[in-house]
Amino acid sequence: MNQEELSKKLLSPSKNSRLEKLGKSLTFACLSLIVIIVAMILIFVAQKGLSTFFVNGVNIFDFLFGATWNPSGKQFGALPMILGSFIVTILSALIATPFAIGAAVFMTEVSPKGAKILQPAIELLVGIPSVVYGFIGLQVVVPFVRTVFGGTGFGILSGIFVLFVMILPTVTFMTTDSLRAVPRHYREASLAMGATRWQTIWRVTLKAARSGIFTAVVFGMARAFGEALAIQMVVGNSAVIPTSLTTPAATLTSVLTMGIGNTVMGTVDNNVLWSLALVLLMMSLAFNRVIKLITKERGKKNYAR
């Protein structure tokens, strides 16, 4: 083999390099497709949602802060649904958080062997469809609330009970991962200094996993805020500002699921529902932003250590 043939052989692309280029091209194509799909969804929802204000002439201030939702009377105040969504989301997260932390501490710190029993039970909750949660809420939670607190049983309280069970697995598993990520020498150092196991759990382990727990709670809130079918079946779907936890109310998702099939595309009644969807989308993006900020702050703290 002369020098020229040897140079051509060495400089020609190998099979591995061609496969690497093919892999990079496929990865870039998949990434581009995902970005395009997300961008198209954002543009479509924004275009339809903003048509309410720029095409149909609905005042954006009246839409966001109006207390009356009556499409037949051309009154499109979304405040009752916005408040309803926030109330059920925040309260269900507040109730689910201590249960999730307790379950996570039990599985990681108290009885890791017990996780073999508890974890499959929690995983079972993840696989239950939303409609089943809603049906159970309709048959069990609503009659219970009606018997104990009076009224129809439909309302914020029933929605809180259903969402509490639905977001509990998410918050629990993410909290468990955060506790397991705490370095072992943190616990050993605390115990070596004379702290009890519960003092170590409370003052060291939970404190070190705090940002991860916050992330878990925000993830749970994002899940609760976007839930539609289950909450629609138990909340009562009354688009008025809730005066108590036991009175019927409505959320952004419940109004969307009930109204989107009863309107004509391009009409003000349809566009205003897309405006509700735009508000819902903005809130989802806000939740994602909060999660990124918490994760970024946790990364800085870990780097500082």
Please tell me what each predicted stretch does.
Residues 1-31, 291-305:
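Transmembrane alpha-helical segments of polytopic membrane transport and secretion proteins
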Residues 9-25, 47-92, 111, 115, ...:
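Periplasmic/extracellular loop-to-transmembrane helix junction in inner-membrane transport proteins
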Residues 91-122, 135, 143, 291-297:
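Transmembrane-helix boundary motif in ABC transporter permease subunits
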Residues 123-163:
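Generic hydrophobic transmembrane alpha-helix motif, especially the helices
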Residues 129, 193-194, 207:
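Glycine/proline-centered hinge or cleavage motifs at structural transition points of membrane proteins
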Residues 174-175, 197-235:
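Transmembrane alpha-helices
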Residues 176-180, 184, 191, 261-305:
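C-terminal transmembrane helix and the adjacent membrane-cytosol boundary/short C-terminal tail
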Residues 231-281:
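Interhelical loop and adjacent transmembrane-helix boundary motif
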